[in-house]
């Protein structure tokens, strides 16, 4: 009996292994992918890719397999690109082939291929072209984006003055002001800083970005086929984004009730007008789902990335007080103590510009980039990537490529200055990605970073609560994003 039972268990195990191998073979793509660590059926490369240090795991694998290699995220093969040359060759030199959006499973349940950031094919081209046009028109219209940022910076300075030099956590001070800039474009108005609905919205955005960077989210991205049916923290992202969608859908209803097609007030109005124009076209991409999700894409990206960069920037400037002093000297020389900073000042302030670039480079807010996908069978560096293969361009590995930055792991503004102290560009500076999927809001984000940093440092000096040498810039969480550590500082009026 015991032998018979053992034999039955053995047969069951063999049968289970056979089923796993059959399933594994079905998900294998034809073609010739780059080399990489040997995967375990279904589990993939879980043993080599730590869910709490995914980016660092990829860098370690690069040491063995080179700048282009394959890892299996669960049963799914993903091609990893490291360093400037490999990423540029794919995203710029072969821009069309690598222009697809890869799978971001942790939010796919919410977006289902809709919205400009996660769409593909003709839907993506239509939504991107429309979004770029509207952002450009608002940037050059009666009330430019620069004026909106300057106005919002003024409100922020007033809030900082109210603190009277007491210690504060800058997180929501910065997210409120940055979010109000994109709010004025997509919603047509700004929120009061104490608006409870606005604060709730910002907390959801902040929490979503954090949740997308947790080990749970990385695990979900690897095993979404199973984990979508299981309870746990990984589902928190889904519910947060659904709440954000509900908020935007409610704003759309408000706009629709008072829409004047001759006088669009914001991005939502412009999209609604296009929806009415295309109402008899059953195949139009101008529908309610794409409106809500594209608005969410713009609002989310326009809030969290810039405010996180500012938070990191405050830390780095306090850690290097000589840099803060030199920026203030440049502000005094070019702008003076009273005039409001403008974008035109940037070309006359090479050191400040270099510092802002170096903050973005060193902190690399989205180190793994957003996944790409090859839209057709693609020959790349002697390999064949079958149509539909996901590709991770590791932006963090480009921003810290030692071939292009002599001190890749240090804060060194001279990376962006020539021997005469003039600003110099660096082709490996890609915090907004590159190629056809480059960030829609790059111009706005660059404008915000310059105007906020100069406005704040023109009016306040930043003081840490610990000695500069003890300031730690290690991310609180590092996954999809590098989440800044929580800290307090004092803003002393000049």
From Swiss-Prot:
InterPro entries: Cyt_P450, Cyt_P450_CS, Cyt_P450_E_grp-I, Cyt_P450_E_grp-I_CYP2A-like, Cyt_P450_sf, Cytochrome_P450_fam2
Topological category with respect to the lipid bilayer: Peripheral membrane protein
Gene3D superfamilies per record: Cytochrome P450
Cross-referenced SUPFAM superfamilies: Cytochrome P450
GO CC aspect terms: endoplasmic reticulum membrane
Annotated PROSITE patterns: CYTOCHROME_P450
Keyword hit for Repeat: no
Heme among keywords: yes
Cofactor: heme
Keywords: Endoplasmic reticulum, Heme, Iron, Membrane, Metal-binding, Microsome, Monooxygenase, Olfaction, Oxidoreductase, Sensory transduction
Reactions catalysed according to its record: an organic molecule + reduced [NADPH--hemoprotein reductase] + O2 = an alcohol + oxidized [NADPH--hemoprotein reductase] + H2O + H(+)
MF-aspect GO terms: arachidonate epoxygenase activity; heme binding; iron ion binding; oxidoreductase activity, acting on paired donors, with incorporation or reduction of molecular oxygen, reduced flavin or flavoprotein as one donor, and incorporation of one atom of oxygen
Tissue: Olfactory epithelium.
Location(s) in or outside the cell: Endoplasmic reticulum membrane; Microsome membrane
GO biological process: epoxygenase P450 pathway; sensory perception of smell; xenobiotic metabolic process
Known EC number: 1.14.14.1
Binding locations of heme: 439
Biological role: Cytochromes P450 are a group of heme-thiolate monooxygenases. This isozyme seems to be implicated in olfaction.
Record-stated family: Belongs to the cytochrome P450 family.
Protein name from the UniProt record: Cytochrome P450 2G1
Organism this protein belongs to: Oryctolagus cuniculus (Rabbit)
Organism classification: Eukaryota, Metazoa, Chordata, Craniata, Vertebrata
């Amino acid at each position: 009996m015991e032998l018979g039972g053992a034999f039955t268990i053995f047969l069951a195990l063999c049968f289970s292994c056979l089923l796993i191998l059959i399933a594994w073979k079905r998900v294998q793509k034809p073609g010739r992918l780059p080399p990489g660590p040997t995967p375990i059926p279904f589990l993939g490369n879980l043993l080599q890719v730590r869910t709490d240090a995914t980016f660092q795991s990829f860098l370690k694998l690069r040491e063995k397999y080179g700048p282009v290699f394959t890892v299996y995220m669960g049963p799914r093969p993903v091609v990893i690109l490291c360093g400037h040359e490999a990423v540029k060759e794919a995203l710029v030199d072969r821009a069309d082939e690598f222009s697809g959006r890869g799978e971001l499973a942790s939010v796919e349940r919410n977006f289902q291929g809709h919205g400009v950031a996660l769409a593909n094919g003709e839907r993506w081209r239509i939504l991107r072209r429309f979004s770029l046009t509207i952002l450009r028109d608002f940037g050059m219209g009666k009330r430019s984006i620069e004026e909106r940022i300057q106005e919002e910076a003024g409100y922020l300075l007033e809030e900082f003055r109210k603190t009277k030099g007491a210690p504060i956590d800058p997180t929501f001070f910065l997210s409120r002001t940055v979010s109000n800039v994109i709010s004025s474009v997509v919603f047509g108005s700004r929120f009061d800083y104490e608006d409870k609905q606005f604060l709730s919205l910002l907390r959801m955005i902040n929490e979503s970005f954090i949740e997308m960077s947790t080990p749970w989210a990385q695990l979900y991205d690897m095993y979404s086929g199973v984990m979508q049916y299981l309870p746990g923290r990984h589902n928190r992202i889904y519910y947060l984004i659904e709440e954000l969608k509900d908020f935007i859908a409610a704003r759309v209803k408000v706009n629709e009730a008072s829409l004047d097609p001759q006088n669009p007030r914001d991005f939502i109005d412009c999209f609604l007008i296009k929806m009415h124009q295309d109402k008899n076209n059953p195949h139009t991409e101008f529908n309610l789902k794409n409106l809500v999700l594209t608005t969410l894409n713009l609002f989310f990206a326009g809030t969290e990335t810039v405010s996180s960069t500012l938070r990191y920037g405050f830390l780095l400037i306090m850690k290097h007080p000589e840099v803060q002093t030199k920026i203030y000297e440049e502000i005094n020389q070019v702008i003076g103590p009273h005039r409001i900073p403008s974008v035109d000042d940037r070309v006359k302030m090479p050191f400040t510009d270099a510092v802002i670039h170096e903050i973005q480079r060193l902190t690399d807010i989205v180190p793994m980039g957003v996944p790409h996908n090859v839209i057709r069978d693609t020959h790349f560096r002697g390999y064949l990537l079958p149509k539909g293969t996901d590709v991770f361009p590791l932006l963090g590995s480009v921003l810290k490529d030692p071939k292009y930055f002599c001190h890749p792991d240090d804060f060194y503004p001279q990376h962006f200055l020539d021997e005469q102290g003039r600003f110099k560009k660096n082709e490996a500076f890609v915090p907004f990605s590159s190629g056809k999927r480059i960030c829609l809001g790059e111009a706005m984000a660059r404008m915000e970073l310059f105007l906020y940093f100069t406005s704040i440092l023109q009016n306040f000096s930043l003081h840490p609560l610990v000695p500069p040498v003890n300031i730690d810039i290690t991310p609180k969480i590092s996954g999809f994003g590098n989440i800044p550590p929580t800290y307090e500082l004092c803003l002393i009026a000049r």
